[in-house]
C-alpha cells in the first residue's frame, strides 16, 4: 500500500497521508540514515568500524542492506550506538533533528515528541549543552518553518548504571531545562530505553519518583521484549505513558487498568516486526487494544534503521487490520489527547482531524 497498487489503495493512501498525525515514539539518533552517517563521519574525522571487522560498514549500500536483518533488539542497538558516534557539534544535532522533522512533516505529522540519548554522547566527551542546544535549534526551526509543534523527551539508558542517569537528571535540573520551575524548560519529559530484559524493571525508580513530585512527564519503554510485568513496573514508578507495550494483552487485569487510567501506548509495529518481537504486523494487538478501549498511537521508533517512517507504519497497520475510517479517527484523536501539549493546541489538532475525516468519509 506504500506505494498503492490499486485505485482503492490510492484512496486509502491519500487518507492516511492526509490524516493529521502525532508521533510520540521516535528516537532522533534513530533517524541517522546511512548516507548521513558516512558524511558526518568524514566531516568529523570519526572512524567507523573497518570493513574487515564489520563488513556492513563497507559502504552506504552494505550498511543499508544490513539494517534489514536485525536478529534482536540488542543486535539493533549495537549498530544504533555506533551510528551516533558521528555526531560531534551542535550543528550536527540540529541537522539530524531537522532531517527528521522535514520527513515527518511531509508525511502528515503535525505534532511530534522525540527522544534523545545524552548519556552516550556525554560519555564520549561531548558537553551537555552542545547536545541539548543542537536539538532545541532543530525543534525551533521545525516550529518556525514547518508549523509543527515539538517536544523533547530525555531518555535514560537501561544498560547504564543508575548513577549515570542520576548525573544527567541533576544536570538537566541545574541547567534549568527540565520541570515546570525550570528557567528555560526545553525538555518536556523523561523516558527510559535500551535493553529491556536484564536490567532491573524499576531501575530508575528513585529518579522517576522525584520527577513525579516535580510534575515532570514520565514515560518508559516496556512490554516490547519483556512481559507485561515490565509495564506494571513502569506504571508503578510513575510513568503515565508506555512505549511499545505490545505484551499488555497477556494481562487482562493490567489492560483494564491501562484503559481506565487512559495511559497512552506508543506502539511501533514495523519496529516490532524488524526486531523479531512479532512474526507479522498482524500479531501486534491493534484490534485487541481498540476493542478494550486502550489508547495508543502508531510510531516509527528508529525509522532510519527499520526502513519505515510514520506513513509506512500507518500503511502497514491498515494492510494488516483493514481498519475503518472511524478506527483511524479514534487512533488520531487519542494520539492528540495523549500528547504533552496544552488544550488550545489539542483542540486545534482535533479540529484538523475532524476536517480530514469529513473529506474522506463518503469516499472510503
UniProtKB/Swiss-Prot annotation:
InterPro entries membership: A/AMP_deam_AS, A_deaminase_dom, ADE, Ado/ade_deaminase, Metal_Hydrolase
One BP annotation, GO: hypoxanthine salvage
Record protein name field: Adenine deaminase
Active site: 224
UniProt key word Hydrolase: yes
Site feature: Important for catalytic activity: 244
Gene Ontology CC, one term: nucleus
Biological classification of the source: Eukaryota, Fungi, Dikarya, Ascomycota, Pezizomycotina
CDD domains (alphabetical): ADA (cd01320)
Cited PANTHER family: ADENINE DEAMINASE (PTHR43114:SF6)
Amino acid at each position: 500500500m506504500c506505494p498503492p497498487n490499486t485505485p482503492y489503495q490510492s484512496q486509502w493512501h491519500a487518507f492516511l497521508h492526509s490524516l493529521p498525525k502525532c508521533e510520540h515514539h521516535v528516537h532522533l539518533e534513530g533517524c541517522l540514515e546511512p548516507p548521513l552517517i558516512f558524511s558526518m563521519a568524514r566531516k568529523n574525522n570519526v572512524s567507523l568500524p573497518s570493513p574487515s571487522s564489520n563488513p556492513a560498514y563497507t559502504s552506504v549500500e552494505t550498511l543499508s542492506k544490513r539494517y534489514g536483518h536485525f536478529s534482536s533488539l540488542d543486535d539493533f542497538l549495537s549498530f544504533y550506538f555506533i551510528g551516533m558516534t558521528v555526531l560531534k557539534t551542535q550543528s550536527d544535532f540540529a541537522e539530524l533533528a531537522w532531517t527528521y522533522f522535514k520527513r515527518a512533516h511531509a508525511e502528515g505529522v503535525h505534532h511530534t515528541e522525540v527522544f534523545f540519548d545524552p548519556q552516550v554522547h556525554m560519555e564520549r566527551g561531548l558537553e551537555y549543552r552542545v547536545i541539548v542546544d543542537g536539538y532545541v535549534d532543530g525543534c525551533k526551526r521545525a516550529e518556525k518553518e514547518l508549523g509543527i509543534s515539538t517536544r523533547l523527551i530525555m531518555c535514560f539508558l537501561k544498560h547504564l548504571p543508575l548513577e549515570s542517569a542520576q548525573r544527567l537528571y541533576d544536570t538537566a535540573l541545574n541547567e534549568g531545562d527540565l520541570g515546570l520551575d525550570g528557567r528555560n524548560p526545553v525538555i518536556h519529559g523523561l523516558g527510559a530505553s535500551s535493553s529491556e530484559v536484564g536490567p532491573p524493571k524499576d531501575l530508575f525508580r528513585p529518579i522517576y519518583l522525584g520527577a513525579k513530585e516535580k510534575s515532570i512527564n514520565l514515560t518508559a519503554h516496556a512490554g516490547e521484549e519483556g512481559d507485561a510485568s515490565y509495564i506494571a513496573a513502569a506504571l508503578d514508578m510513575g510513568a503515565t505513558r508506555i512505549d511499545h507495550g505490545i505484551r499488555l494483552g497477556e494481562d487482562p487485569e493490567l489492560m483494564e487498568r491501562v484503559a481506565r487510567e487512559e495511559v497512552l501506548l506508543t506502539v511501533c509495529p514495523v519496529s516490532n516486526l524488524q526486531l523479531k518481537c512479532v512474526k507479522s504486523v498482524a500479531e501486534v494487538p491493534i484490534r485487541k487494544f481498540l476493542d478494550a478501549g486502550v489508547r495508543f498511537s502508531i510510531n516509527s521508533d528508529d525509522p532510519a534503521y527499520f526502513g519505515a517512517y510514520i506513513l509506512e507504519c500507518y500503511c502497514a497497520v491498515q494492510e494488516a487490520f483493514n481498519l475503518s475510517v472511524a478506527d483511524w479517527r479514534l487512533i488520531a484523536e487519542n494520539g492528540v489527547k495523549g500528547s504533552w501539549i496544552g488544550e488550545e493546541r489539542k483542540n486545534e489538532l482535533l479540529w484538523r482531524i475532524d476536517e480530514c475525516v469529513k473529506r474522506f468519509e463518503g469516499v472510503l
